[in-house]
Amino acid sequence: MDATKIKFDVILLSFLLIISGIPSNLGLSTSVRGTTRSEPEAFHGGKFPAMKMRKLMAPNMEVDYSSDYYDGGSSSSTTSPSPPVPDYDDIYRRQGDVPSPGIGH
């Protein structure tokens, strides 16, 4: 019975020693460092110039585009006149090419 108790104690002690030694071997020690350095400085040992951080800016979704469109009978408070409808026949005449009506017209 004493032999099994000793074996268990030895196994438990060796297990605790291994577990307590692994974090320091892997650099995962939980002790607080005396100097605080950034991760690149800690790994590469040196000072690096400050890098400019990019910010992702959300577009302004509250822009009023109502003046871009005119629906004719809108009940909006703005009373902007509708743009004149272009005379396409006049445009084609100026170019010397009046479109003929399609088949069946």
Curated annotation (Swiss-Prot):
Q: Name one GO cellular component term.
A: apoplast
Name the residue ranges with Low complexity bias.
68-80
* Annotated stretches, region: Disordered: 68-105
Which residues are part of the propeptide segment?
A: 30-90
What are the Hydroxyproline sites (modified residues) in this protein?
P99, P101
The entry lists its GO molecular-function terms as: hormone activity
Name the keywords, alphabetized: Apoplast, Developmental protein, Hormone, Hydroxylation, Secreted, Signal
| GO terms of biological process kind | nitrate import; regulation of root development; response to abscisic acid; response to brassinosteroid; response to salicylic acid
Q: What induces it?
A: Induced by brassinosteroids (BR) but repressed by abscisic acid (ABA) and salicylic acid (SA).
Q: What PTMs does it carry?
A: The mature small signaling peptide is generated by proteolytic processing of the longer precursor.
Its transmembrane ranges are none
Q: Into which family does the record put it? A: Belongs to the C-terminally encoded plant signaling peptide (CEP) family.
| Protein name per Swiss-Prot or TrEMBL | Precursor of CEP15
Q: Which organism is it from?
A: Arabidopsis thaliana
Q: Give the gene that encodes this protein.
A: CEP15
